[in-house]
Amino acid sequence: MDQMRGHLELGYPNEACGALIGRVDAVDHEVIEFRGMRNIITDRPWDRYALDPLEQLRVQKDAESRGLEIIGFAHSHPDHPPVPSRFDADHAWSFYSYVVASVQNGVLREARSWRLDDAKAFQEEPLRVDEGAASS
């Protein structure tokens, strides 16, 4: 997803973030588009992120108006592996997919998707991306 790659690389050396918009079926999440959002963390933006709640609400309403929903979130880990941190786990909800992208020296090198299980531990998951819709 070029939109996600560009936004997460642009945020380097800080964490950048955004919403994954798409559909959920009985088995997995399908990403239709990525919406870059502002990281409102100011004291440690290089290793923390938080979304602006009002911006998140606007993105959610826009998605719902098109029959879609926020199915997860993506954020970068500057110069670190694409594995959720303890901070990530402490601030995550179980329904959503969380894409963590390793951005090394400003270049996205690897991204992996995770979801919390019932024990509040992240489990890696496959994530379907509708490349046709995502590139529009």
Regions of interest found by a model, annotated:
Residues 76:
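Residue-level "edge-of-site" marker
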Residues 73:
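Conserved, mostly hydrophobic/aromatic
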Residues 1-70, 79-136:
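Conserved beta-strand-loop surface patch within small alpha/beta domains used
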